[in-house]
Every structure is written in C-alpha cells, then in structure tokens.
Design a protein with these regions (language model features):
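Short beta-strand segments
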Residues: 45-47, 100-103, 134-135, 174-177, ...
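Short glycine-rich anion-binding loops that position phosphate/pyrophosphate groups of nucleotides
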Residues: 17, 50, 79-80, 103-106, ...
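Electrostatically charged, flexible surface regions
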Residues: 148-256
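Short acidic, Gly/Ser-rich segments with clustered Asp/Glu that frequently serve as metal-coordination loops
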Residues: 17-25, 226
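Glycine/threonine-rich flexible loop motifs
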Residues: 106-115
Length: 256
C-alpha cells in the first residue's frame, strides 16, 4: 500500500516486450516525470526477450536466470508474471507499486486474458501490491513515438495513486490512443475517461496454411488465426470504444 504522496515511493517496472523495449524506457521516464522526488527507488525486472501474448504463464521445472543489466535493473529468462513473482519475493519485496508497460499495442477488452503486460500487473495485485498496466494503441498510419507518454500520463498516474491510497481500486489498466502527438495543438492531451472493460470477444477465423485440396481433420495441418483488431466489435462507452475513439481509457480491472 503506498504510504502517501508526500512520502517516498518504491516502485517496480516490468513489461512483456522485453528489457530492451523502448516502451520500458518510456515507462521509466513517465514514472519519473509523474512522481519526481517522491520516488525513493525504481527497480526494473523484465523478460530477456519478447514475451507478448504469453498470458499469465509461469516457469516451472527449470531455473529462472536473472541477469543484472544496469543500476537497479535486471532481466529474467521467464515471463512477465515470473518477473513480478521473483521481484516481490526475492528482489524488492517492499515495493509500494508495480507498473507494467508501456506495451507497444493496445490491451483492451478480452485481450486482458492473454496479455503478458496485464498478467504482470495482475500477479502483483494477487500478491497484495497495487499495480497499473499501461499500453499504447498503435495503427499503421500513425507514427510510433514515445516522447509524449510522460505528459499524456502524468496526471492520470498521480490520480490513480491517490485512488489506490483511498482504497478505490488496486488494479488498473490504461490504454493510450493511436494519435500522432504532432497533430494536436501545443500542450493538448487526449482526454482520459474511466470506463468498463469490454467483454465482447474478438471474432476469429482459422485459415489453413494451404487451401489446396480437401481438409482432412485426421491429418496434421497448419492453420493461421485471422482477426480484424482495428474494426473489432465493441460496446458503447467501453475501454475499446473509448481508446479507439481517440481518448485515454482507464479501467478498474480487479475482476480479471
């Protein structure tokens, strides 16, 4: 439980895109910008490689390799959930808050069931530490920049810390919209909206790797999954609707 905003904070940063991902550096810059001198120490423990869509998988039956990569920073050979488990039991059990992200791509609606980014936050919450998962919706037609994340997120993160301190929720999911910061007027920030997590499943189609000949379910075949992420169905006012509509979505996600 964070002590208070007038006191110092110890935080853990993690992600599912890996220790070298630009979104992790953006997360560190964002947290430092939002909390400044209130930070006592920032720990980082993230997977040593890309672990997107690994869900809440954990490693068992094999060693977890931890490598120091910098000041108060380490990589792990496991999943995002492994990182949080190790950190909260063996590395920094006294942290006040866990941040996971910033994911290069949205984690909205039922995506939370497979998101490694959100699983890391959920693991922290399950172990009694409040957590915030952060993702950034991306589109092919919008530049993939990170420099704007501190100004876009600072107010929201401070607000959520205050809510956590008041007992108004301890597991939050944030998604930034796919907007070119340069398209906004100077100093403008997309509005932040509190909204529920959409429970509408994304439609899927499994297509054979080769369509020649008849499908024989008795024979091994390769299939590709196809979905239309950007045009997925959504409920009005849900996290998908809010984020795809150009606003910052903020969802209390303890039910996940």
């Amino acid at each position: 439980m964070p002590r208070c905003r007038r006191c110092t904070l110890r935080v853990l940063l993690t992600n599912d895109d890996g220790i070298d991902a630009p979104g992790l550096e953006a997360l560190r810059s964002t947290v430092e910008y939002a909390f400044g001198d209130e930070l006592e120490r920032v720990y980082t423990l993230a997977p040593d490689c890309q672990r997107s869509e690994c869900g809440h998988g954990v490693s068992s039956g094999k060693p977890l390799r931890i490598v120091e990569t910098g000041s108060s920073a380490w990589s792990a050979s496991g999943t995002p959930a492994d990182c949080v488990r190790f950190a909260l039991t063996s590395l920094c059990p006294d942290v006040d808050l866990v941040f996971s992200g910033i994911n290069a791509g949205a984690n909205l609606g039922t995506d939370l069931m497979v998101s490694g980014t959100f699983a890391a936050a959920r693991e922290a919450h399950n172990r009694g530490v409040p957590a915030i998962a952060i993702s950034h919706y991306r589109r092919p037609d919008v530049p993939r920049t990170w420099q704007h994340t501190p100004t876009w997120l600072a107010s929201t993160l401070r607000d959520l810390l205050a809510r956590i301190g008041r007992g108004e929720g301890r597991l939050w999911n944030i998604n930034l919209p796919a907007i070119d910061p340069d398209s906004l007027s100077p100093g403008s920030i997309p509005p932040a909206v509190f909204c529920p997590v959409d429970r509408t499943p994304i439609p899927l189609a499994y297509l054979p790797a080769t369509v020649a000949g008849e499908l024989d379910i008795q024979t091994a075949r390769d299939f590709y999954v196809e979905s239309d992420f950007h045009n997925r169905p959504r409920q009005p006012g849900s996290d998908i609707d809010v984020c795809f509509g150009g606003k910052i979505s903020i969802s209390l996600a303890e039910q996940y």
